[in-house]
Amino acid sequence: MRALSLALGSGGGGGAGGRGGEFDSLRAVFARLGSRARGLGDDCALLPFGRRTLAVSIDLSLERVHFRTDWLSFREIGWRATAAALSDLAADGARPVGVLVSLGVPGDGRWTTDDAVQIMSGVGAAVRSVGAHVLGGDLVRSPRYLVDVCALGVAERPVRRSGARPGDGVWVTGRLGGAGLALLGLRAGHRLPPALRRRFAQPTPRIAAGRWLARHGARAMIDLSDGLAGDVGHLAAASGVRIMIELQRVPCWPGVQPRGAARSGEEYELLVALPPRFGARGALAFRRSTGLPITRIGACTTGRGLLMTDNGHLITPPRSFDHFPAR
C-alpha cells in the first residue's frame, strides 16, 4: 500500500474552529428553536432517567454521500451506519440499549429483498457486538439507499463536549488515518488489506473505552467522525477553551503521515480532555482494561479555538469534512 501513503496537504481552518458551512447552518437552525432547544450540539441528547441518564443519538447514512454500493457489501453498509450512531453513545460514556432503524431502498428496481435483509444483518451484527438490540424501525421507498439509525443508551456519568478546562490534557484513543487511507485505496480501485478494509467498512464503536473514561474523570469527549482538526475545534468551542495539538504526537495508522491523520474522517476513535493527574499510569490502566492505546496529543489553555504545531512550528490546521463547504 505504499502508493496510498496518506500525507494530505493542509487547507484553511474553517472546520477546525467549530465553524464552516455545515455548522453555520446548524447554528442558524438552533437559533430558530430558541428556548425550546436544550443541549443541542452534543453527540447525544441527554435526558434524566431515574438515577441515570438516557442518551439518544441519530445518524443518517446516504448512498453516494456516506457509502457506495460498489465499494461496500450491503451487510457492511448496515454495520457502518450503525457503528456511526453507536459511536455517539461512546462519546458520552453511555452503555447501548438498542437501536431503531429507518431503511430506504430505491423504487427503481435496483434492490431486492435480500439487499434489505443483508443491510439489516449488518445492523444486527453491529448492535450485538456491543450487547444491545434492534428495537424496531421502518422501511420506505427512496431515490437512493439510506440507513437512518437512532441509538439509545444509558449513562451513569454522561460526558459532554463542554467540560474541558485549562490545564487538562487532550488524549486520543487508538490510531488515526486508517479510514482515510482506505478511502484513497477504494477511489483508486485497489483491493484493501483485510485490516484496512475493516477499519473503513466495519469500524468499532469505542463503547468500553468511553465508559472507562467516563468512570475515570473524563471532563469532555467527542468521537472523531469529522476528522481530528474539526472535532478538536468542536470540543474547544463547546468548552470555551483553546486546545493546542502537537501533530507529531498523533498516533498514526501504518503508512499515514500526521497531517493525513489529522484530516482523516470517520475514524470513530475518542478525543477526550482529562485532568492533569491522568498520565502514564492512567494510560497503562486504560490499555489493560480496553486493549487500546491512549495517547496525549495536546492540552487545553485559556483562550478560544485550535492551535496546531508540527515539531514546534505553528501550522494551519487541515480542513475537515463539511457537508456544506463554503464555495
Where do the model's predicted regions map?
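Glycine-/charge-enriched secondary-structure boundary and capping motifs
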Residues: M1-A28, L72, G107-L135, V140-V147, ...
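N-terminal glycine-rich phosphate/pyrophosphate-binding loops that anchor nucleotide-derived ligands
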Residues: M1-A91
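Glycine-rich anion-binding loops of enzyme active sites
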Residues: R51-L54, S61, R95-G185, A299
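Short, compositionally biased
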Residues: G180-R197
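Residue-level recognition of short, solvent-exposed, well-ordered loop/turn junctions
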Residues: R165-P166, A208, R263
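Alpha-helix C-terminal capping segments
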Residues: A90-R95, A237-S239
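Long, charged amphipathic helices and adjacent flexible linkers at domain junctions
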Residues: R199-P203
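Glycine-rich, charged/polar anion/phosphate-binding loops
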Residues: A31-L33, L40-D43, H133-L135, E156-V159, ...
